[in-house]
Amino acid sequence: MARYRGPKLRIVRRLGELPGLTQKNCTRDFPPGQHGPKKKGGGNQKTKESQYAVRLKEKQKLRFNYGISERQLMSYVREARKRKGSTGEILLQILEMRLDTIIFRLGFAPTIAAARQLINHGHIVVNGRRVDIPSSLCKVNDSISVALNSQNFVKNLLQSFTKTLDAPYLEVNQEKLSAVVRDNIPREAVSLQINELLVVEFYSRKV
């Protein structure tokens, strides 16, 4: 399944706030549809979701927030299961340590998709070398920065959006547009509202 390239607010209406997907706020609090919110028996009561639907929704939150394909997510679930600890928390840690997510969390881009473009176009340096693979996984003590010849471009980009940095595991130098990964991300620092256990349960018979 390829990455979604359609209307972002449509996804937000269906899944809820996705900070990595868009900064725009959704003014409608019901899922997208031709006739507005669904009603049961003509009243305001919502139709109860099945357990499968609830798990699917949590899985889709991860996919759309981090901008990854179904195949990539399944691969990350497999990797998380191999490591010691809570599979769900390790899965989130892997996704948050992707280079595109780190660039977004540093406030160098308004969305993860925008961060991916910066990386693809060669604007990002990791440990002294240009890296153009957004899915590269960062490690503790990695040094990440904007390339010297890209500094003005990124500084101009920063003026086009509002970003509040909330990543205590990253040591940031805003003036030099650089940072060091000081620790693995703690669970409470993940900005996405997600029940990762339901995602693991969704894939329990698939991987």
Curated annotation (Swiss-Prot):
Region feature (Disordered): 22-51
GO BP, sorted A to Z: ribosomal small subunit biogenesis; translation
- Give any Pfam family that matches: S4
Q: Where found?
A: Plastid, Chloroplast
Q: Where is the S4 RNA-binding domain?
A: 97-158
Q: How does it assemble?
A: Part of the 30S ribosomal subunit. Contacts protein S5. The interaction surface between S4 and S5 is involved in control of translational fidelity.
Functional note = One of the primary rRNA binding proteins, it binds directly to 16S rRNA where it nucleates assembly of the body of the 30S subunit.
Family to which the UniProt record says this protein belongs: Belongs to the universal ribosomal protein uS4 family.
Record-linked NCBIfam families: PRK05327.1 (NF003717), rpsD_bact (TIGR01017)
State what protein this is by name.
Small ribosomal subunit protein uS4c
- Its encoding gene is what? rps4
